[in-house]
Curated annotation (Swiss-Prot):
GO terms for cellular component: plasma membrane; vacuolar membrane. Monocarboxylate-proton symporter that mediates the efflux of the waste product lactate in the intraerythrocytic parasites; active in acidic-to-neutral pH range. Transports L-lactate. Inhibited by the Malaria Box compound MMV007839 and its derivatives BH296 and BH267.meta. The keyword ATP-binding does not apply. PANTHER family: FORMATE TRANSPORTER-RELATED (PTHR30520), FORMATE_NITRATE FAMILY TRANSPORTER (EUROFUNG) (PTHR30520:SF6). Homopentamer. GO terms for biological process: nitrite transport. This is Formate-nitrite transporter. The lineage of its organism: Eukaryota, Sar, Alveolata, Apicomplexa, Aconoidasida. Residues 298-313 have a biased composition (Polar residues).
Length: 313
């Protein structure tokens, strides 16, 4: 900066990505901000996120089902359908990011770090997590019923040449409920590691295109790997029940949704949030100290930036 210039260069904003310490601070602030919303606002944001998951799971199911045509399936199996399904589904997370919607699985990381840093109380933590989970369920299942089911897009056909979309969803649902409890928990852990990393990428990468690509491939990885995501499964398995696929309520809710919920929570709150808190907890303390003085220029700049971002939410 030249002497006497009224313009200053923000050492944070000129970078396209944050440091590891800055990313953690952003994660805590992001989680802390969620506790400030009233219940109805949290619920509306969570329902919207559930709808977005339903919208893109519907599109993914249709796209994958078209490649599940019985003659094609004889040669390539489910591989082509899985590729197309995984390539379509990440759009849901980009919609959630763009609209500021609230997804339970991402909250397992962000809000947990805020809890560990004592920026939210246990009661606030439980309120945010329970409302986000309930709202996601309402949004995903409502879309499954009012759009996917009532439209007849996944209905069963007697003619095998027209039954590939139903068969694709049926086979996915059967596979999901066939896991043992422990297997499902493990697959859910793998899933939410990717989802929470996608959230972390959003908080770390400032370049728009870089952020989109990072989120896209993180979500694509879990979708094509056959991992278990609680909100996506709420849509898929409840739709399978509605169209009378070869699953029942016990298999859906006890054999899949319960262990998936446990595994997703373990991944975000224990596998990721706890180590990050242990590594960077002092960085957040330093960040808080710089709010009142100019001790560390980088953290001071981040403090100003985070406060400006918070005031805009």
């Amino acid at each position: 900066m030249t002497k006497g210039s009224k313009y200053t260069i923000d050492p944070i904003s000129v970078k396209t990505a944050c440091t590891s310490e800055e990313s953690y601070i952003r994660c805590v602030e992001y989680g802390k901000g969620k506790a400030h919303y009233p219940n109805l606002s949290l619920l509306a944001k969570a329902i919207l996120a559930g709808v977005f998951v339903g919208v893109c799971a519907h599109a993914s199911g249709i796209a994958g089902g078209h490649f599940y045509y019985h003659k094609l399936r004889e040669h390539v199996g489910i591989s082509m359908s899985a590729f197309v399904y995984g390539f379509t589904f990440p759009i849901a997370f980009l919609c959630i990011i763009a609209t500021g919607s609230d997804l339970f699985t991402g909250n397992t990381l962000a809000v947990t770090t805020a809890l560990l840093q004592r920026k939210v109380t246990l009661l606030e933590y439980l309120r945010v997590m329970s409302i986000s989970l309930f709202g996601n369920y309402v949004g995903a299942v409502s879309f499954a019923f009012f759009v996917s089911h009532l439209s007849g897009a996944f209905k069963k056909h007697e003619e095998i040449g027209k039954n590939h979309i139903f068969q694709f969803l049926n086979d996915i649902a059967e596979k999901k409920v066939s896991h043992t409890f422990v297997q499902c928990v493990c697959l859910a852990i793998g899933c939410n590691i990717f989802v929470c990393l996608a959230v972390y990428f959003v908080l770390t990468i400032k370049d728009g295109s870089g952020m989109v690509f990072s989120v896209f491939f993180a979500v694509y990885a879990f979708a094509i790997a056959g991992y278990e995501h609680i909100i996506a499964n709420m849509y898929t398995l409840n739709l399978a029940l509605m169209i009378e696929a070869n699953v029942d309520w016990t298999k859906v809710y006890v054999d899949n949704l319960l262990p998936t919920l446990i595994g997703n929570y373990i991944a975000g709150a224990i596998v990721l949030a706890c180590p990050l808190f242990y590594i960077y907890r002092h960085s957040y303390s330093d960040y808080e100290k710089t709010r009142g003085d100019g001790g560390n220029s980088g953290l001071k700049s981040l403090s100003i930036e985070m406060q400006n971002g918070s005031s805009g939410r």
